Curated annotation (Swiss-Prot):
GO biological process: 'de novo' IMP biosynthetic process
InterPro entries listed in its UniProt record: AICAR_Tfase_dup_dom_sf (IPR024051), Cytidine_deaminase-like (IPR016193), MGS-like_dom (IPR011607), MGS-like_dom_sf (IPR036914), PurH-like (IPR002695)
PROSITE patterns tied to this protein: MGS (PS51855)
Domain notes: The IMP cyclohydrolase activity resides in the N-terminal region.
Gene that produces this protein: purH
Protein family per UniProt: Belongs to the PurH family.
Pathway as given in its UniProt record: Purine metabolism; IMP biosynthesis via de novo pathway; 5-formamido-1-(5-phospho-D-ribosyl)imidazole-4-carboxamide from 5-amino-1-(5-phospho-D-ribosyl)imidazole-4-carboxamide (10-formyl THF route): step 1/1; Purine metabolism; IMP biosynthesis via de novo pathway; IMP from 5-formamido-1-(5-phospho-D-ribosyl)imidazole-4-carboxamide: step 1/1
Name of the protein in question: Bifunctional purine biosynthesis protein PurH
Organism: Syntrophomonas wolfei subsp. wolfei (strain DSM 2245B / Goettingen)
Taxonomy, superkingdom: Bacteria
EC number, UniProt record: 2.1.2.3, 3.5.4.10
Amino acid sequence: MKRALISVSNKEGLLDFARGLEKLGYEIISTGGTYNTIKEAGIKVKKVADITGFPEILDGRVKTLHPKIHGGILARRIPEHLQQLQENDIGPIDIVAVNLYPFRETISRPGVSLEEAIENIDIGGPAMVRAAAKNYQDVAVVVKPEFYQALLEALEKPGGISPEFRLKLALEAFSHTAAYDAMISSYLSRVSNSDLNQNLILAGEKVYDLRYGENPHQKASFYRFMTPGLGLPDARQLNGKELSYNNIIDTQAAWELVREFDEPACVIIKHTNPCGTAVAATLEEAFDRAFAADPLSAFGGIIALNRPVDGATAQKAAEPFMEVIIAPAYTPEALESLQAKKNLRVLELPLEVAGGLQIRTVAGGFVVQESDRDKLDMDKVQVVTQKEPTVEQLKELAFARKVVKHIKSNAIVVARDGMTLGVGAGQMNRVGSARIALESAGEKARGAVMASDAFFPFKDTVELAAQYGITAIIQPGGSVRDQESIDECDKHGIAMVFTGIRHFKH
């Protein structure tokens, strides 16, 4: 008689699967809660303990770790193995259907203790899954309910399960256990404050396949990390088509920046750089000012807002062509306006998004760093010029600095009254970025402030800023020629402060 071992924490589809196996003549073996569920449904089932002759012990920690289980799973259907099974009174097991203790759900609960988490680390389950996957040519292993029906259909065919489907199931199984172990490793790293271990293991779960990547000829998919933490994959999409690869990257950039501000704020992003950023007394005004900062570049951009969106703001945001709008919430009036634009992707995501590591691949590996979440205390900046910035200028410098840290280096921001006037991004020399930002601001630069993501290697950036009427500058400092820039500021009556903190972004 063919035998199937079933032990699942996720009972979805379990009874239909068990009935299907029973109909096909399989003897079903099971454990604990799975056994009870199957038996109560009137389906014939045997306890693992009845097969092993050994009871579950240690509060259920040891159930299936027994030669009569693992021998039955690992035995090849070759004479030598079958003879050894017979000599040891072990029956072959042909199907293993196992999914693991809900570790992710456990560690996602607020206030969960380390002890609770440890008790939800599955041992016997992964051992059976790996054993069955290793012996995939003779044992079918299924770890997800969505494969139950396909497996039943394959079993009903004259030739049984194809080698290709067996291999696919084995791949799913090994991926399942690898992701499970990675999740445990990540959790223990977090609770022990050891984020950058000697071995860094990442586990992701596919959200969906993307139409294409950065360009149409590139394949792409969207994954979420399997460890708990709210992020972009958790955003509720309330309108529009699925996000594209570029939408996802740009939306993340917009969301990171808009979360910098305590007051109502709006950010408009193109190609991960902000073309307009503004704060104001109301969200509607913040949108108006952010859009006015660079309406030409805003076309086809990403809007991020850090307050629930009201009807008036939504009505204005729906007028120009935009790809995505993301905010913590929307009023019914706001949704009515936004959903009238069928192609506008409307996302809802709480501001309390988890931080994390930044990971970038290189040939043969990847580099990892902490996210740049520095919160500068403006009371601790160093005034290095004869002229001190006013209280109002310090406020403007703080705003400009929050923006500049989110721009591709070399980065320069010109701002005034809580609004960007010009942005210079990604130039190979700093004065080049300054020229772009200042030319974009034009006459509006007179009386404005400037922020730089890194020090000025020469005084030329200050010279250019003076020509446009910049009154105050914030930068990290640290150049061997800092004094030349300081002297140039003093020459033109510009106030300058050093933060001591660089914000390169590549």
